[in-house]
């Protein structure tokens, strides 16, 4: 991750559910209340802030915050991905689905989530590659726009690079044929 990587910055800004474990005075504005936050207060925070608070602890106390998996990695979404990764429009769940997933795997020891994310990426990457190769031919099955709308940012980047590679290879072969 680069300091200037826009996708990394936007991934860090994704909201994740969490719960404060202690009373925190003067932070009521996070929950739109005039008072401080009480223990067991649930709210959503940007990933960068929730991660720092969840990992912050002292030798004498626990973390002030418990971090939960975001809605894009809920049981329902993971079940749908297990059934058929191609059928789930990841962009509807999170623009940076894989980025958030990887960050959550850094924080949680969730082998099931890791396996679902891996399988999802492998299966969908094949489709992305096929569509990237056929993009100039009107896309596969005539539903190119719908396919692209369901891709999250990593997949869109993969599509762009794949399409540029196919175009470059075609230009090169045409150039070689002329000489």
Swiss-Prot record:
Q: Return the InterPro entries for the record.
A: GINS_A, GINS_bundle-like_dom_sf, GINS_Psf3, GINS_Psf3_sf, PSF3_N
Q: Where in the cell is it found?
A: Nucleus
Keywords, alphabetical: DNA replication, Nucleus
Main location, first listed in the record: nucleus
| GO CC annotations, alphabetized | GINS complex
GO BP annotations of the record are: mitotic DNA replication initiation
How is the quaternary structure described? Component of the GINS complex which is a heterotetramer of SLD5, PSF1, PSF2 and PSF3.
Give the record's family classification.
Belongs to the GINS3/PSF3 family.
Give the protein's biological function.
The GINS complex plays an essential role in the initiation of DNA replication.
Protein name per its UniProtKB record: DNA replication complex GINS protein PSF3
Q: Which gene encodes it?
A: PSF3
